[in-house]
Amino acid sequence: MSAQITHLPANASREDQLHFMEEDGAVIIDDVLGNKQLQALDQDLTPFLQQKVFGRDAFTGFYTQRVGALIARSKACGELALRPRILDAARTYLAEHCDDVQLHFTSAVAIAPGESAQILHRDRGIWGGYVPRQIEPLFSTIWALTPFTRENGATQVVVGSHRWEKKRQADPDEIAYAEM
């Protein structure tokens, strides 16, 4: 059996959410967004995704669209970033090594049929070796606006790998898919 990411209900306690973040490095909170929010996000993002601009390399995906600067482009995306529950979780998770949080990056991603799986990577790699491994510099969120499955490109997550040594590589059965 392959690895799994724990799913919690939308009303799960902050403590439960943080427990799985700290232990596993990931948790999925189910049914957080209602239909009205999903419709607003779809309405805001559709004009940008209709432009059909795809990645230019294997990492970003030749059949993957990415739209950045979402706070400037979408009121609904801005509301997601400012959700008190998310900010509270991020502040608590990162508190040991920071005074507050800063939004670093926003991106809408649409994966078209025929895309290959992105290579496994650690997001913290954007800092090279400048941030000691004992310091966690990131708290990332992924919001599934449409079904997010292994078959259509759900993000691969290696549960617990945030505690591994840098050179340790995942075995295939250690890879979970952020299906939601």
Question: Can you describe what each PLM-predicted range is?
Answer:
Residues 2-24, 30-131:
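Non-heme Fe(II)-dependent double-stranded beta-helix
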Residues 5, 26-28, 119, 140-144, ...:
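Conserved hydrophobic/aromatic beta-strand scaffold that supports enzyme active sites
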Residues 122-129, 143, 164, 170-174:
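Active-site glycine-rich loop that binds ribose-phosphate moieties when present
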Residues 148-180:
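Double-stranded beta-helix
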